[in-house]
């Protein structure tokens, strides 16, 4: 085919939302839709209007606000669904009605209790009704991956005759393998006589981990639309991840025949984080493209390679998706080259220190802490081993009262002196933070706060990680407890001790 543009159809707000424990609010959905528009998504599937009044209103509001993306709504092959979709969409500058019906023998017989001819008739009738509202109609053959190929070809041919401009071939249960799914698309192009009258779309689920692979294999056989979600959100194991297919197409143009998308890749990272925050679905650290470890290197061999030439272990530049740094994690696996480079970045000439000595001390600290930060490394240059391990601030006691005015009382030991303060805050965590700031007489800014469960059950331990900014530098702290407020206090105190050690280093520099 001459047109190598791949249309990106995002269904985060419809299929992606089905994976969430609770529905998103209208304003939350609008916020995501506007981010998708800014990302350059061609088609935004905003919801399923007939499913609830809330979904109807959300689709309607998105349709009224988004101007640069086509807004799509889903409907079953039923008149009431299609009519409701139109009512929600009609205010949009560009809109699409997406209707579907199952085509696999299993679904037709066991779920719908009908035969193939009845399903064919329903599909054609639905497409014709949708066409009465708009020329932009998409039809999906649900469970196409398990539909007998002759039936699928016949359904697609008749759907195009009825007026569908986009035909979607979903691997609804993530059953097919890439070569198998590619062959389905290939057969459609070979056997459906009017296939050139429509755009072929694919919608792949990730039950066997094949969603991205199946989608890419399909465009090699002629598909020109990929349906996907931010962070791969979706029912069961999720959907094809937008960030994965887009960056695969961008990175492997040599193999993927010059295909391209209109996605503004530099907005991928921030869109991923926004969706994660709004949906309260954390991004796995090892997630391709957008995971926190996607551009991290901790192995000494890898770090040495990246320091010499980033392409040795990075096939994508972090800046390509809007990340302006790659993380070179200092751990016990890091080599001397990494430590030397970090010290150079901190301004230390190699003639002013003994690398072997610093590296030995670094390993002792890394074995204890796990991850070492630049301020820890700098402390190695000026402080004795005992001073490195010394904590100026120690949390002794903590009590919190929640309610209309959250209040915390914190007792800390500073050297041999006990100091106690009570403070209020917008919540118990802020109240604790205010207490510690007052006791230490240090005023950092809280830049990041996260909680992760480290076990399950009612006695689960929660790990709190915080980043505090002080004098233009970030300091990390970590706490672990079955009480999340106590874990927060531990994390704050940990970061405050890092700040204190950095101040001692500054004093030594000035001496």
From Swiss-Prot:
A GO BP term here is:
L-leucine biosynthetic process
Task: Extract the InterPro entries matched here.
Answer: 2-IPM_HCS-like, 2-isopropylmalate_synth_dimer, AIPM/Hcit_synth_CS, Aldolase_TIM, LeuA/HCS_post-cat, LeuA_allosteric_dom_sf, LeuA_bact_synth, PYR_CT
- Positions binding Mn(2+) in this chain are 15, 203, 205, 239
Which segments constitute the Pyruvate carboxyltransferase domain? 6-269
The protein's matches in HAMAP family, at most eight in alphabetical order, are given as: LeuA_type1
Q: What does this protein do?
A: Catalyzes the condensation of the acetyl group of acetyl-CoA with 3-methyl-2-oxobutanoate (2-ketoisovalerate) to form 3-carboxy-3-hydroxy-4-methylpentanoate (2-isopropylmalate).
Q: What is this protein called?
A: 2-isopropylmalate synthase
What organism is the protein native to? Campylobacter jejuni subsp. doylei (strain ATCC BAA-1458 / RM4099 / 269.97)
């Amino acid at each position: 085919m001459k047109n190598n543009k791949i249309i990106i159809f995002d269904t985060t707000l419809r299929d992606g939302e089905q994976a969430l424990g609770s529905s998103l609010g209208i304003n939350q959905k609008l916020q995501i839709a506007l981010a998708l528009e800014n990302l350059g998504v061609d088609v935004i599937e905003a919801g399923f209007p007939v499913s609830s009044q809330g979904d109807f209103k959300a689709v309607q509001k998105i349709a009224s606000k988004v101007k640069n993306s086509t807004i799509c709504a889903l409907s079953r092959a039923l008149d009431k669904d299609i009519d409701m979709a139109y009512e929600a969409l009609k205010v949009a500058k560009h809109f699409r009605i997406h209707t579907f019906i199952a085509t696999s023998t299993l679904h037709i017989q066991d779920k719908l209790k009908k035969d193939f001819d009845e399903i064919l008739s329903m599909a054609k009738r639905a497409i014709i009704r949708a066409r009465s509202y708009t020329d932009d109609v998409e039809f999906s053959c649900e469970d196409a991956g398990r539909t007998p190929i002759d039936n699928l070809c016949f359904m697609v041919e008749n759907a195009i005759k009825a007026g569908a401009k986009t035909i979607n071939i979903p691997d609804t249960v993530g059953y097919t393998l890439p070569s198998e799914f590619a062959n389905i698309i290939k057969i459609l192009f070979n056997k459906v006589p009017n296939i050139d009258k429509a755009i072929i779309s694919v919608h792949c689920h990730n039950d066997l981990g094949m969603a991205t692979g199946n989608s890419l294999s399909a465009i090699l056989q002629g598909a020109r639309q990929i349906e996907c979600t931010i962070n791969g959100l979706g029912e069961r194991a999720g959907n094809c991840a937008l960030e994965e297919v887009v960056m695969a197409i961008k990175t492997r143009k040599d193999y993927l025949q010059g295909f391209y998308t209109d996605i503004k890749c530099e907005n991928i990272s921030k869109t991923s984080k926004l969706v994660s925050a709004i949906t309260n679905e954390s991004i796995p650290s090892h997630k391709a493209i957008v995971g926190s470890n996607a551009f991290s290197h901790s192995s000494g061999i890898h770090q040495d390679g990246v320091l010499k030439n980033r392409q040795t272990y990075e096939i994508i530049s972090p800046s390509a998706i809007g990340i302006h740094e790659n993380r070179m994690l200092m751990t016990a696996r890091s080599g001397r080259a990494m430590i030397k480079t970090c010290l150079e970045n901190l301004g230390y000439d190699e003639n002013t220190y003994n690398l072997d000595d610093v590296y030995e001390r670094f390993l002792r600290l890394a074995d204890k802490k796990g991850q070492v930060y630049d301020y820890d490394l700098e402390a190695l240059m000026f402080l004795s081993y005992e001073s490195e391990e010394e904590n100026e601030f120690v949390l002794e006691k903590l009590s919190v009262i929640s309610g209309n005015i959250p209040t915390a009382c914190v007792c800390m030991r500073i050297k041999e002196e006990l100091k106690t303060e009570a403070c209020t805050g917008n919540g118990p965590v802020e109240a604790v933070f205010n207490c510690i700031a007052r006791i230490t007489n240090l005023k950092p800014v809280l830049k990041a706060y996260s909680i992760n469960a480290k076990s399950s059950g009612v006695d689960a331990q929660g790990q709190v990680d915080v980043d505090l900014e002080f004098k233009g530098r970030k300091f990390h702290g970590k706490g672990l407890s079955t009480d999340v407020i106590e874990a927060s206090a531990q994390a704050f105190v940990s970061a405050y001790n890092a700040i204190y050690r950095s101040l001692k280093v500054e004093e030594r520099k000035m001496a």
